[in-house]
Every structure is written in C-alpha cells, then in structure tokens.
Amino acid sequence: MFDIKKYQGIFPAFYACYEDDGSVSPARTRALAKYLLDKGVKGLYVGGSSGECIYQGVEERKTILENVMAEVGGKMTIIAHVACNNTADSQELARHAESLGVDAIASIPPIYFHLPPYGIAQYWNDISAAAPNTDFIIYNIPQLAGVALSIPLLQEMKKNPRVIGVKNSSMPTQDIQMWKDEGGPDFVVMNGPDEQFISGLAMGATGGIGGTYAVMPELFQKVYNLYQAGEMKLAAEIQNEICRIIYKMCSARGNLYAVMKAILKKHGMDIGSVRKPLPALVDSDLAVVDEASAMIDAAIAKYC
C-alpha cells in the first residue's frame, strides 16, 4: 500500500544540467538536486519536459537520474519520467529507475502517431510491467502529446494496481476534479500548469509538479502552505504574482528554460543552457532575465 503523503506538496520539475559544451553534467545535476533539497521541497520530477527528455538519449537520461538519486535519493520523493518514443527504451528506463529505488515512474502517452486508447493503455502497462514494484503515474499533457486522458482510459489503467495517480498538465482544472473523483480519496492528482496551481488545489490536486517551481520554490511552497491553512486571500495574491513572473519570463525570445537557467545562474546555480533545437537567449533577453529575477527576489522578500 503506497503512502499518499509522499506525493503531497511541491515537486519541481528537474531541469537538464549541461556542461558548457552541451554534454550532460553529473556535477551540475547533483548541485541542482542538493540546491532544491535545501529549499525544502517535497520531491523532484526527473526526466520530464522541463528536463528536456525528448532531446536526450537513453544513457544520458540514466546518468541524470543516477546522479539525482546519489545526491538526494531517500531524502525526498523522486518521480522519474521514463517515456521514450518506443516501448523498449521506455521499459529500459523503467527498469533502471526501479533499480535505483525511485518512488514512482511516470509516462506521457506515445507521441506523433495518435494511438487508440487501448494502444495507449498497452504502452503504459508495458512500461509499468518493467518496474513491477514501483508506483506508476500517468502524465496527461494533451497540448504537447496530441492525445488526452479520458475517464474510460483511466478506468482501464486503474486495473493496474501500480497506477496511483495522474500528473495533469491539461489546461482545464475540471480535469483534476474528474481524475480525483474517479480515482477516489487516495488517488494522487498533481497539478501541472503553474499559473493555476491554487486553482488545481481547489479542484482536489494532491500537490503540484511544475516547470517554474525550481526558480522560485519559496513562492509555490508558500501558496501551498497558505492554502492548507485556509488563508485563501493571501495565497491567491501570491499566485497572481507568480503568474506575472511567468509572463515576464515568457516574454523573452529565448526558450523559457533558458531564461530560468539564467536566473538560477544569477543566484549562484550554474547548470548551463538549453539543448538545441530549443532557442538559447539572445542579448535582448538579458533585460528580461534581470527583471524576472528581481520580481522573484521582491516577491520572496515580501511573502516568505
């Protein structure tokens, strides 16, 4: 029987950490894991969209997870996203993740070809079978995967006893309510869209996994704690400021993750840039980095 408390709280989506030459950096990976552990977050979501997984090979993804686990394994909840464009590689990453002792694995549906629901279920169950002693979390992100989770598909997946929840990155918060209602009180549903974290909590989310959490974990933790304490007005005020920060970061020409990595560098955490084809920063983006960084610092000083 799994412990739902392991999945309650803030889970930064872990960023890809590269050397200056673009290769995966074990040292920087460990440094970022330690940095986030010290921030007091509940856990990490490793190898997902924010980790640039679709631009990495299987061995690179193994290296990243190995170094995260070596640094913080057993000290926080670790969810490893293991999906690849083919089942065999996904199963290899699932077996590897289980061998390292992660708390859960997760997977998006197969991308590019839009498979029927029974094909998606087979893909997920094949991955889960490769890690039979590890919790499995469905990752619903239809705007990028091209296919969406449905109640019938969730009902089919619930026949697998390892399936404990959904990471929901679809935009309607109603989806969170539907997955939670179908899954029951001990079913994990994680809010995905950072801009509506407080709304996701209100609809029943257990916690959140977010791509911007790592650059401002203090603010998301404050929103979560205030929500749990029933202080909704202040929680909403901070959520609105988080949204303004995200909008500012998204105003750059370079990719959002390049912006956030530059902000982390300003705070002493150099994890490199993004991997092509994600656009790197251009000179005009430096002002955006400075402004967003100042907004984060000011919000933390005001609210945390």
Model-derived segments and spans:
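Active-site beta->alpha loop and helix N-cap motifs at the rims of alpha/beta catalytic domains
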Residues: 2-148
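A general structural signal for well-ordered alpha-helical segments in protein cores
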Residues: 29, 61, 65, 90, ...
